[in-house]
Amino acid sequence: GSIPCGESCVYIPCISAVLGCSCKNKVCYRN
């Protein structure tokens, strides 16, 4: 929830979700 994964999720889901990232405020975060 606090580490940005350097990916946005405005139009498409987080590709980095496979690494444990999730969408938050249109940006992909981890932990």
UniProtKB/Swiss-Prot annotation:
<dbReference type="InterPro" id="IPR036146">
    <property type="entry name" value="Cyclotide_sf"/>
</dbReference>
<comment type="similarity">
    <text>Belongs to the cyclotide family. Bracelet subfamily.</text>
</comment>
<comment type="function">
    <text>Probably participates in a plant defense mechanism.</text>
</comment>
<protein>
    <recommendedName>
        <fullName>Cyclotide mden-L</fullName>
    </recommendedName>
</protein>
<keyword id="KW-1015">Disulfide bond</keyword>
<keyword id="KW-0611">Plant defense</keyword>
<feature type="disulfide bond">
    <location>
        <begin position="14"/>
        <end position="28"/>
    </location>
</feature>
<feature type="disulfide bond">
    <location>
        <begin position="5"/>
        <end position="21"/>
    </location>
</feature>
<dbReference type="Pfam" id="PF03784">
    <property type="entry name" value="Cyclotide"/>
</dbReference>
<feature type="disulfide bond">
    <location>
        <begin position="9"/>
        <end position="23"/>
    </location>
</feature>
<dbReference type="GO" id="GO:0006952">
    <property type="term" value="P:defense response"/>
</dbReference>
<dbReference type="InterPro" id="IPR012323">
    <property type="entry name" value="Cyclotide_bracelet_CS"/>
</dbReference>
<dbReference type="InterPro" id="IPR005535">
    <property type="entry name" value="Cyclotide"/>
</dbReference>
<feature type="cross-link" description="Cyclopeptide (Gly-Asn)">
    <location>
        <begin position="1"/>
        <end position="31"/>
    </location>
</feature>
